[in-house]
């Protein structure tokens, strides 16, 4: 007869990461202005521009690296196209979006493990 006991083995790596970083996530979320009563349209546009300035170069570097682990569905997780679409909303055209400043202090993406770590952080 098969046992119906729940597996009580060691937590998965993902569970350990979530547990180990949960307080940091809470602290970070408290600093983000998304739900601030003071966030106006101009502030939201600047926030989108800042996110684009980070996500566009890091996603480009990730996908150009050729080191993303097999089986990772990038189409479901890429954020840059959505940010571009959202930036069109307040009237920015593609030329203005392409001229936005980009983050140049990117992490090294020279191993599959480094790429996986960055993908984990980007996923939030």
What name fits each language-model region?
Residues 1-124:
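Metal- and O2-centered redox machinery and metal/ROS homeostasis
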